[in-house]
Amino acid sequence: LDTGIDDTLALLYVLSKRDEINLLGITAVFGNVETRVSARNSLTILDLFDRKDVPVYLGQAAPYGKESYKVKEEVQLIHGKNGLGNVSFPTSNREIKDDGIKFIRDMILAHPGDITIVPTGPLTNIAALYERFPEVLKVEHEIISMGGALTVEGNVTEVAEANYYKDPIGAGIVFSKNISLKMICLDVTQQSHLYPSYINKWNGYKGNLIKSMVEFYINFHKVGYCYLHDPSAVCAILHPEYFTFLNIPLYVTSQGRV
């Protein structure tokens, strides 16, 4: 997770399906916020909703070939400076664990054929996994990635979607591997909307915090709703019947040529 607003909604979706999804852990990555902020945000949401049993690990702090990552001002306009719509949540003081890449590797090896990884940010952690631990490529696991744009315009450039744009080299590494990868792209997620009439049903202390966060997100979009980008990727685990998947070869280029 690069825990911004729609990542938080995706996490809450998972937490609401505890009988159907066994959440083994979260690895943080850069994107909507810096990696360490992402990790702290994830812990904050987990603790608020009584899931202190779920560990959070640090992942990669910068795109492939880069030494650092700085959140752009336009991203802060979407998710707020804290990634949570500038809403003051009770901060978790739980430990952020190190080496999220090894954690993913350990979980794949411990649960062969029964692991689904849902990257809702740049694919840098997954690229690092395959580069550092190539043995996992021989073990069955599934990736459901929120990213990309095929038949619609990107949301950063005319062709680029934000998650893959932030690390095209990392995305390219992942797409070059012979793995089970489902891409939940803007073509799908921009058809999934969250309206004020729905969030107005949320109440109580926790509900009002989340409502305030989502209101920030809706106000940015200026169309009367917000897109459910990352929750759509989680939905693909629980309800694959809602989706039509096309089995096609894809690759990522960072050279400006298609």
Regions found by a protein language model. Name each.
Residues L1-T44, R51-K52, E67, K81-N82, ...:
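Active-site histidine-anchored catalytic micro-motif
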Residues L48-F49, I237:
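Alpha-helical structural context
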Residues V56, V174, V234:
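A residue-level signal for conserved active-site and pocket-lining positions in enzyme catalytic cores
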Residues L58-Q60:
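A conserved beta-strand->alpha-helix junction
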Residues Y64:
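Feature marks short, surface-exposed loop/turn motifs that line or immediately flank catalytic pockets
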Residues E73-V75:
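Large eukaryotic, non-enzymatic subunits of multiprotein complexes that serve as scaffolds/tethers
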